[in-house]
Amino acid sequence: MDSDKYKKFYVYNHGFTKQPFYERNLNDKGIHLKELKRLERVDEPRLYNNVDKIPNKKEIIYNNIKSNNIQVRVNQNNNEEKKKEEANYTCVNNKYVTLKNKVHVNKYVNNSNINKIKIVPIIKCSNYKIKNNPISHLKSNYENKFVKLSNFSNIKNGCSHKDNVINETMDQHKSEQLNNDNIKKLLYDYCIFREDTIKTKTNISYNKMNSFKDNEENINYMDNNNIKSNSSSYCSYSNKINQNNVNHTHLKTEFLNEKNSHTQNEQSIPLLDGLQNNHNSATKFHNNIYDNNNSLVNYKSDKGIDLHNKMMKIETDKNGIITLEKKKHDEKYYNNIFLNPLNDNSNNVVITTCDNKESYRNSTSDMINKIFEKMMNEKKNILKMKNFNDVIKKKITMAKEKILNSNSTINMKKVSFYNSKDEDLFNEKENSYKYGVKRENQEDINVIKNNMKRNNINIDNNDNINIIKNDSVSKNIHINNKKKRDDDFPFNNSAGLLLDFDLCKRKVLEILKNVQSSKKKNKILTNHNHSSDNQNCHSSDNQNCHSSDNQNCHSSDNQNCHSSDNQNCDSNACNKKDEEKKRKKKKIKKKNKMKNKSNNKSKNKRETKSKKISNNNNNDNMNNQCDNMGDQRINNENMDKQNVNIQNEGNGFNNNKNNNDLLNVYISPNMINHSLSSTCEKKNKEDNKMNDNKFLNSSSKMKIPEISTNNSNEKIVNVSNDEMLVYHNLTVLNVKEQGGVTEESSCIKRTYFVDQFYDSYNMRNEKITDDNMQVEDIYNVKENIKRTLKGDGHDDVKTNMLSEDNSYASGLWGNEINFISNNENCLNSYDISCDEKYIPNEEEQDEELCSNNILVKDIEEKKMCGKLFFEEICVFRINEKNEHGHENLRKNNHNDDTHKMYSSYENIQNINKQSTNPFCKKDEMEKSQGTNLFYDNYINSVDITKLELNKNCYQHINYEVQNLIKKENSYAAEMNVGLVFRKYIPILINLSCNYLLIKKNEKNVITCISYTNIIDVKIVKKSKKNKERFLFKIVYVFKKKEQKTEKNVTLLFRANLMEIFEKIKGRVDYCIIPNEDDKNIQLQDKKKKKGKKKKELQEEKMKKKKKTQEYVDIETVYEYVIEKYKRVHVLYLGRLLQIVEKLFKKYILKYSFHKLRIFYEYKIEMEKLKKNYIHCIYDISDKLEFLIKKKMQHYFNHIIINSYESSFINYQIKTNDMLYNLLLKEKSAYQNHLGKNYILILYKVLLSMYKKKMAIYFRSFVYNNIKVSKKKNAFAYTLTRVNSILVLYERRIKSFIFSKLKFNYDNVSYFCFTMYKIYLRRILFGYLRIRDNRINIKNVIEKNVYRLVKLISKISDNHKYNAFLKLQKYVYEQNEKKNKMICDNLIYANNELCNNLDKIAIEKGINQIDCLIKFKRKECLMKYFYTLKGPQINTERFYYCIRYCSIFSFVLNKIIQKKVQHIFFQFVLKTLQRNNKNRLTHAIKLLQVLVQKKEKKSVIDVLQLYDKYPYIFQYKDLTKIEVFVICVQNFVTLYNRKLLLNFLLKLHYLKYQEQFMKTYNGIGSIYKFVHVLDKKLMNTIRESFRVILQNDKFLREKMNMKMEQMDMKMEKIDVNMDQMDVKMEQMDVKMEQMDVKMKRMNKKKSKQIHVNYNNKAYSSSSPSPMLRYNKYKDMSSNSASLIKKYPFLIYNSEISPDCTTMADDKLSLPSNESVTHIFSYAYEDMDKIKKKIYDFNNKMSNVDL
């Protein structure tokens, strides 16, 4: 099985990582699994790694067990068959047609380990609606109203569900304004639709789904992520009067209405492929979009006006309007259409409405040709990305052909990326943006309306002024609202994607976004300055948004905005560039003068300078305001998003806790007002100097700092000497504040981090750098780092990354492993480039990997943390440090570095240097000042225990450790052993890195001497006969660890090779450390060495530094290297996720078109199936749940009744009444002197004294054991556990004490058995003695009983020592046997499971085990319930709390101990028991303490809760048994299938990680299991016991009320009965008189009198007194009647002579047999008893009591 550990790769997705990166929409995860099964063989976009460097070419995909979106595959070597099946498809006439031009992503996209990811468009779970109005109320003249969006989280069940997105046909009177703003409600994520005319294909129908209520207000369709965008945050709807008639038709809206003359069809086209393959269809596509989307209403109004025909007439005048508008606004359209998308690096939004439809058609092919000629001339300035060069060239040519062939631009609709996690955050912002409802600022609303209507530049000059004002007002609204609220959250950068006219063009040319001329950049620069000026002008006031000065500036300079020729614009731009350069030089000179001032002054000056710069640039930038109006809108929105990050930088961290979206994990630029202008200036210089080959090594002036997170916006970083870097645009996400984010995706972009770091450095270089520092230096360093991050090389990072003094590379040697903690502030070159080079050559491995000089600091830090390494594992090192107060024979003069390494962990904390050791505790990390961006925030958030390395990493580790062994040279020699007679034995001398090992053979090591401890190595004698043989001695310092003493030891060796002596001598001279005696010699040597060169002094210093290195054993090396590679793997996993995210955003439109083309054909059928499928599932689940509950209730009732009548009640009576029956029968057998009271006194006294003495024994033994060992080991813990068992199970102990005297406890609690046998034997003897001396003892009193118990305790004290010896022996023997058996069985089962890994078989087995365990557990719970009830003396006054506490504690302990402790813990810990026995017992103790606390706290709290609130009880009508059944059912749900599956996965995981993980994984799993158990108990048990307690109290109150009513009735009945008695006496007197009369008349009229007599007697006769009183007799006093009517209440019956008979063991019915017959196994004949008593008396007489 050893060879399999490199062949399999498993991803265990469990633990802190809540959500993988591909699960973006939470609501869509489990619903689309069956829908997407048909897409398995469809062409998938692939992200290939460097295939040439991976010989196996295996594709590793991360798998979610229940998801089919991303599948785990290990492809075979022959992938040709699958490649043949791959093809692109397009939809033509509702059929699949393969495309010849097959576009794939470049196979060498990035250095990732994932080769294939399946990207599938998911149906959008929209969180918005569109308000539609009936046709009957439409008017020809209407106005657009803008309503602020609000979140409809209260109707999320219907709104955000996937089957409500595209649904059925709308009613006849419901219509919709199909506008560019609201069309996106019908779209999928990352998908684009278009609409065609009547000539297109068949119609599309949708299913009906009425899932929403009517008459909703403020219906929204916008995404939560678009809160901060100005124009995308508002939706338009017409006719606000009809607001109450809204039906939520955005789920029922159709593209095609049967009664509508203007039909539409929905199709999806690819943005690039469609333009390239079919130019004619593209032109039709443009015309159709223009016609359909710009029509006001697509339906006929009630007045009979055909609006479609009316719009067709408008089309006739289209060409004339185009020509007029073209002459006026050629230049403005040129700038708005093409320059804005090129300059727009962020996902800004430009809204296009239907009012200015002609302006979109004002482009000609000549102008486009000019643009692309300029773009092609400047394409050298594209970022040098090796893997994308070929793709960029293809995209340039393709984009040029597509746009040239298209006569009109593409007017696409908007796509909004849905983020369901921002719902709560959106609710918080809802009240501050309700413009359409409250109308707080009417001016702002009107301005926003104008802004929505006027998106194009082709308007008069006066209109342009209004647009500028409107933009500034909209920005001011956002800025002021941000100032009012401090809880704003950072805007999601990718959430504002909207596909409209400009965005479509921008996405086509996205790869050319950096291809710009210097002239265009100057225009952009003015735009940035102008946007910053606008913000400064309008940030102070809320309503007075624009001042008169700005209006004058805009209006006065509007005439200069437009030029007839392009050359004028270019010349103006060139002049702008020169002016900006001059202005920049002046700023640099001013700022360099102020660099030595304090930080506070620098902050004030920075604020004043930003204002001055904005004011100076204000008048200069007015000339190009109108030219770049489109740029201004885009850049202003970009500034708006960035300002959100500015103002919320300090407070935004707390809000980011709720946002777990991967898109929000980025380093947002913290821009200030004048930062954009400086950024553009720096970029101009960088682009102009790209091709210069003068790369200056300016790394000595820079350092990647250790960034400390503060609440303020600025990060002040300490750098060596006088340099100080102040960062404004680098946001550090703290671990504590970003816990949720880092759990999901602990990664950042490498290249993006470098860009942001150096851009921020360039922004502030005016205050940082000296006069000699140039922008070229910074740029060259950035480019070098980016090459090393993206390329294949590894060596450039060491030299170019950091400086000589502060760098990480300078502190390392050639033969040293570049571990993480060797330098605290920096990344290591090997860490950065490990995943790119999995199988290096042997030479490279020898240079980079093969080294064994591991610093002791790394191992010491592990040991100090106390998590991974314990005292049993750490190898004893001879050179271990002594305490500070102890004086050694030899003191080493450590330098500062070694002092830090050997200092304790507390001293390291006091120095305030936080190491990057990933094993540090969280509390210790928070105390430190510095944080490392890569490790603290990302690596520590990943659960290392769930991480596995792939095969190549294991091979690296194995190869590296083997090289450590290979470098150790061994020589054969002889060593002197004898003292008097010289006797030499053959040995092996092994020259290790820092130790000299002397071995007798390969297995037996004689000693291990550190080179630093060797004092002298000399040749003693050379043999005259054999010249090669010689004697040499080694004198070293021997240190005793316990006594802390040292002494010199001399060893004699005899060898034939002089090489041995030379090697040892060289190692000792290299590592020699001067002692106190040599200080004087050093002082003399220093005087002589003054004349030496600097190089020799440096070499000596470097030799002295190596004295801190020590030899570490191979096992420790394995552990450390594995931990290192794990963290490297986590780092690369983060980088990989970020790269995949970047590529996913870049190519998502193209791939979504491709998938949508395939998904389009069968989506109608899937929609029909969805509704039926979901309804069917809900119906079946509801029915199954109801049937299961009904069956379980019936089953429990059946089990309770049968078990109650069969065995449980008899067992209870037998155990609880045993003592009473024994004493009662013995009393009747011998004499009557011993009464019942005295027997009860004896019972109670013996029990209490027994309990006290046992507690004393436990405490004394534990105390003595702690004194000896200073730790609670396993034996001491068994005693404490036994004591807790005695306290918890008092009733069970009583029954066992006086019934069987035999106990069957488990291994750990065997101490109970031993003490019972010793102590109870004495109690029985004392009882027999009392019974035998019945003649002499007349009365038994309490004093005699106490005296007897004291005598018994003295006897038991004498036997205590032997009992403990027996216990100790038995515990360890039984534990070893049982643990061995359990481990063997479980390991065998685990091996079989892993070898025969079948998913179906595993699920079946888990189901069977689950059912079996639940069935057994239910029966056990019922048995324990009736066992623990105990004898109840009084039925009316019953202590419910005690009874239910005992039930809960007993059941919980039994289940947890048997199912968890003896199976899981013993299996996991047995594998570690060889080295960690103390750890084993400590873990078990923690679990036991936790369970005890839960029993005490939870139950008592629930009982108190029931007493306070009895009226909220919902099971009032149920009986006690039914309530308990419900509690048991709730309790059983705790142990579900998930825990069993996790347990099997852990076994599978431990199988492959056993030799590496050892202790840490086992203990970590235990702690995690305890945490899960604690959480489950709190969630399940509280409700169960609340039910029980509420029922009890309710029943008690109900019974009390009934009893009071019965008493009142009985009193009334007694009064009535007394009156009736008086009347009856009077009636008796009258009857006697009547009898006399009747006798007289009997003779005359016998027949008639007889008949009358009988009637009168029958009617007048009253019931007898017995009948009268029995009728109203209280039935509760008669236990027999209660048992017949309520058999469950038998346990409440009193102890009476009627109930003293015992039941037979075999039969469940009561028996009247004698006690001697029933307990024949316990009692013999009377003669034998008398003999035993006689023998007992003889023995007791010999004992000294």
Swiss-Prot record:
- Practical and industrial applications: Possible candidate for an effective malaria vaccine as determined by epitope response in sera.
Q: Which GO terms describe its cellular component?
A: cytoplasm; membrane
The residue stretches assigned to a coiled coil in this entry are 1080-1110
Per UniProt, the ranges with Polar residues bias are 524-574
Q: Quick one: where's region Disordered?
A: 522-635
Keyword annotations for this protein?
A: Coiled coil, Merozoite
- Superkingdom of the source? Eukaryota
Q: Where is the composition biased (Basic residues)?
A: 582-612
What residue spans carry the Low complexity bias annotation? 615-629
Its recorded name reads: Uncharacterized protein PF3D7_0207100
